């Protein structure tokens, strides 16, 4: 199971935004891949080299899109640049009897801040967002936001905010939940303890094993494999750097263009 959440806080907004044309779908997909990779690269730069990074570019893009809906002028242009001209409104993520994919959006507004009704209506209509006005000085509001996040990630993420600042006027959140079986399942009995070569040290960890045919590629010395989930719509792409190299050394070579080529 995979859960993710992203929150954005806003000091002011103006709800005037024109959605870009959706005719160039291929370019749109390429831009989305580029955004995801750049988002990961920027985030990775903020942590220590021996720390793990787990994030959801989709959640970040949805939260930023909700902000972009209320932007204009130079701010709108900056959102366009970051998101590649794409807006991530509510969409069918393909849940069925086999897999579960849920995305939920919410907008929390300070009772000291007024917001245009048409901006709220747009988020409710296009993003299926839950919208509420709250007292940001009340600690119960933080608890309510965390409870909402927990509810929409099946309890996997129960805490997203510690506190709210008196200067905060809005909180926008996207919560994402994913649970699906592998198309080619791993045999639990085949799991064995093996050595994982980390950046700091080698460590013995349980490793799954599966012998089957998968999509495979090599690029800049890295090995890539795609592990599809049942149904074929979603997959996990695993990148193994050359021996002795860490993620920081290979990230410059992982681009949207390189990803499409593979």
Residue ranges and their predicted role:
Residues 50, 89-244:
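Non-catalytic, conformational "gating/processing" segments within enzyme and secreted inhibitor domains
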């Amino acid at each position: 199971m995979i859960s993710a959440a992203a929150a954005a806080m806003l000091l002011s907004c103006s709800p005037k935004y024109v959605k870009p044309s959706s005719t160039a779908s291929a370019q749109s997909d390429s831009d989305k891949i580029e955004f995801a990779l750049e988002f990961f690269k920027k985030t990775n730069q903020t942590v220590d080299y021996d720390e793990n990074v787990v994030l959801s570019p989709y959640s970040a893009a949805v939260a930023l899109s909700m902000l972009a809906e209320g932007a204009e002028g130079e701010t709108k242009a900056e959102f366009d640049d970051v998101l590649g001209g794409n807006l991530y409104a509510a969409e069918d993520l393909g849940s069925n009897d086999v897999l579960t994919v849920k995305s939920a959006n919410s907008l929390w507004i300070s009772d000291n801040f007024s917001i245009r009704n048409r901006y709220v209506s747009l988020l409710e209509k296009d993003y299926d967002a839950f919208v509420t006005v709250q007292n940001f000085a009340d600690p119960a509001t933080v608890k309510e936001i965390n409870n909402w996040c927990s509810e929409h990630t099946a309890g996997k993420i129960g805490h997203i905010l510690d506190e709210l600042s008196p200067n905060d006027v809005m909180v926008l959140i996207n919560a994402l939940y994913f649970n699906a079986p592998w198309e080619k399942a791993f045999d639990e009995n085949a799991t064995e303890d093996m050595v994982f070569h980390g950046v700091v040290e080698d460590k013995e960890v349980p490793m799954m094993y599966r012998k089957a045919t998968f999509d495979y590629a090599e690029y800049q010395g890295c090995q890539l494999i795609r592990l599809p989930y049942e149904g074929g719509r979603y997959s996990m792409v695993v990148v193994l750097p050359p021996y002795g190299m860490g993620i920081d050394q290979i990230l410059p070579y992982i681009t949207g263009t390189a990803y499409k080529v593979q």
